[in-house]
Amino acid sequence: MSSQSLYKVSGNIAANALVNNEQYKTMYQESIVNPEGFWREHGKRIDWIKPYTKIKKTSFDDHNLSINWFYDGTLNASANCLDRHLAEHSDRVAIIWEGDNASEQRKITYGELHADVCKFANALRSQGVRRGDIVTIYMPMVPEAAVAMLACARIGAVHSVVFGGFSPDSIASRVIDGKSKVVITSDEGMRGGRAIPLKRNIDDALNHPDVTSVEKVIVLKRTGGKIDWVEGRDVWWHSLLETASEHCQPEEMGAEDPLFLLYTSGSTGNPKGVLHTTGGYMVYASMTHEYVFDYKAGEVYWCTADVGWITGHSYMVYGPLANGATVLIHEGVPNHPSPARLGEMIDRHKVNILYTAPTLIRALMAEGKQHFDQFDGSTLRIMGSVGEPINPEAWRWYHEVIGHEHCPIVDTWWQTETGGILITPLPGATDTKPGSATRPFFGVQPALVDNMGNILEGENEGNLVLLDSWPGQMRTVYGDHERFVLTYFKTFRGMYFTGDGARRDEDGYYWITGRVDDVINVSGHRLGTAEVESALVSHELVAEAAVVGYPHDIKGQGIYAYVTLTRGTEESEELRQELRQWVRKEIGALATPDLIQWASGLPKTRSGKIMRRFLRKIAANEVTNLGDASTLADPAVIETLIETRLNRTE
């Protein structure tokens, strides 16, 4: 194996991990050669009401698409997260909650969570919710968000969680598409010291003329802030629980019955409702959580994602709770009121496993490691990264400052559509390379293809596809199956197209290069924007960078970089030239940025993803029609970038 920046698995970790490298190779080979046998065995990791006898009926043929797993079995997702732990672990803490203000903390045992979920499930039934109904959840990061999801699953309702930062228009489009009968929200949420007007946003969304399906709005009292009230429609959460029973028999659901809808963010046009079903999803979420994070019984696990994203669904609620973990939920942001908050929470709650995003790591990097001088971190064992490719510089900082150079990092690649992690290191099995997602999880068959769909062998770069199904895969786009087929299975026949580009190195490791539309063609040569961004961020004065292509008379496309400098660094023409030479040295002359624009901030969604379509338009000087900016955390960033753009033609 190439030794360049290789972090080897320590003997101690390999000896104590669920799987070592030899076991990984054996299990992976079996999962590909004999998927029926492999998943027949591993499907037993969850509890079934009626055990399955049929494992897999799948086809990626776009004329005969079929995705079915464990399809004659029945189960209940809520029972798998709660009931099955009660006999032995009723007193184990299921959820540790810390509010935006650290003085607010709660601990909820599995027994208590079970009672809360049963009561709220009965409350939902009292408001007319029935099996198959769609319930929209628009909640802050409080335990009741998980309670609402599990209560829906308990009675066979389909939850559609909308991220608590989305605008009324975004909420309305999702409610309309799903024809939601009931909406669950809160008076307000708290984030970074500010109150977020959740109920007001719901009121505005439901005033949309095309919203006609909603009958009830259930409101949790979080802050006690002033809200408007619609008599006959609105009802308090606590009022419903006063008369609700703690006993609620879980509904028997088919493996292929829907569990939830989750609308993908950042897409143009109508929202895309990703539909996940029950059996395969629960098997895959619980299995990936256990193996990827090398989870051991009773450990404290902290996923910093919001419950409104797929990461919150799979790796804050369903996966960890199915495995009986103690889950830390944080209402605010882990760098408020100071960058020390992340370390303080790890120490305060004795966190063993941390799963967070590169955008947070880079934000902490920019503030400086002095904020972690008092950080102990001795309980931390495994660290994960999710959401986008992590640049090597941020990886190393994470490893050194947060992990104290003893915690393996699992850099995970997956999507809303995949339900769970697809490409990832395993802590006891995989030597890691900063920036690489490394190898596929069990049952996952990645491949690289050229633009004609020809499979590329060996060390190569191309479009990332998947050759066969896995249990956590989405089943359809809600209400638009043709869109599902067209988006994922028409581009490359017989394959699932991820929309991402990747390269495979000499060791067979995968490096995600970004969305295919984040590839720049400079003078006939393809350059992944992630590669140029990583080079820029490896400079000590650069906190964050985003790179896009723009029309260039000679090269076809030029390279336009937006650069945020570290705190206290002065912008100058000299530094601009230094960065151009830095990238030239790191990658080569071809990758030298043509234009570098200083950016005090980048346009991001509230989950931290950079909205590159805005950056592409600004770089191309197309600033009159930027499109919908409702999902941006701070729309004012766009105005600043437009005013300071470098590619003006007028």
Curated annotation (Swiss-Prot):
Its cofactor is Mg(2+). The modification N6-acetyllysine is found at residue 609. It holds the Pfam family AMP-binding_C. Mg(2+) binds at residues 537, 539, 542. GO terms for cellular component: cytosol. The keyword Transferase does not apply. It comes from the Bacteria. Its EC number is 6.2.1.1. InterPro entries: Ac_CoA_lig, ACAS_N, AMP-bd_C, AMP-bd_C_sf, AMP-binding_CS, AMP-dep_synth/lig_dom, ANL_N_sf. It catalyses: acetate + ATP + CoA = acetyl-CoA + AMP + diphosphate. Acetylated. Deacetylation by the SIR2-homolog deacetylase activates the enzyme. ATP binds at residues 387-389, 411-416, 500, 515, 526. It is an enzyme of class 6 (ligase). CoA binds at residues 191-194, 311, 335, 523, 584. One of its GO terms (biological process) is acetyl-CoA biosynthetic process from acetate. Gene3D superfamilies: 3.30.300.30, N-terminal domain of ligase-like. One of its GO terms (molecular function) is acetate-CoA ligase activity. Keywords: Acetylation, ATP-binding, Ligase, Magnesium, Metal-binding, Nucleotide-binding. Disulfide bonds: none annotated. Catalyzes the conversion of acetate into acetyl-CoA (AcCoA), an essential intermediate at the junction of anabolic and catabolic pathways. AcsA undergoes a two-step reaction. In the first half reaction, AcsA combines acetate with ATP to form acetyl-adenylate (AcAMP) intermediate. In the second half reaction, it can then transfer the acetyl group from AcAMP to the sulfhydryl group of CoA, forming the product AcCoA. HAMAP family: Ac_CoA_synth. Belongs to the ATP-dependent AMP-binding enzyme family. This is Acetyl-coenzyme A synthetase.
